[in-house]
Amino acid sequence: MNKIKHAIFDLDNTLWDFRKNAKLALAELYVKHDVASRYNFSFDEFHPHYHESNENLWALIRDKRITKEELRERRFREAFDNLGIFNHELADIFEHEYMETITNFNEVVDGAIELLDYLKPKYTLHIITNGFIEVSKRKLESSDLTPYFDTITYADELQILKPDPRIYEFAMEKSGAKKEESIYIGDDWIADAVGAKAFGMKAIFFDR
């Protein structure tokens, strides 16, 4: 049996708390643009619509049915449309400012730092993320996660997303790791757990 030498992580919602940080960023924009008083919908009414739209569109990206550019065009428009707010100019402003605002928040998943501190002396650590490259870099820097990792593989480098086996192959070549000596940890059943196992790696599904 091969000894595990490399631990490879997903980023969003595995280490960096996307759900919490996204909600904080959106709440800030909601107040900034006075949406509640202009349209008589509270943030708590808006947020589930955004979350559902974003999750559904990322699933379509994973299944190669839409592009990331289409996600950025659609997610806020759909969220506002579902509330009867047909203001696409406002939706587009939210999209632009959201991508800038979200990295002002740097909450990590509970226990993530303690886990990385424990693993770092024992294993070589890496990341593979499907997230937007420039935003992901800012997330890692603002949350002080970067120093833990020897390599970080961004899907945007290849224009290929997990669970496509080519992104795992690219990460192996980049890191010099062997899949038989690696384990992958992530919160997305299809992109992370199924994708890594199909490639031939051991995988841990982080079910939050």
Question: Could you tell me what each predicted segment is?
Answer:
Residues I93-E107, A112-S143, F149-A155, L161:
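Substrate-recognition element of Asp-dependent hydrolases with the DxDx(T/V) motif
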Residues P163-K174:
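Short loop-to-alpha-helix "cap/lid" segments that border enzyme active sites
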Residues M1-N2, P121-Y123, K174-E181:
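Glycine-rich phosphate-binding loop signature in dinucleotide/nucleotide-binding domains
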Residues N2-V109:
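N-terminal helical cap/lid subdomain that shapes the substrate entry/recognition surface
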Residues K179, I183-R208:
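Acidic, Mg2+-coordinating phosphoryl-transfer loop and its flanking beta/alpha structural elements
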Residues H88-E89, P147-T151, K179-I183:
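Short acidic capping loops at alpha-helix termini that bridge into adjacent secondary structure
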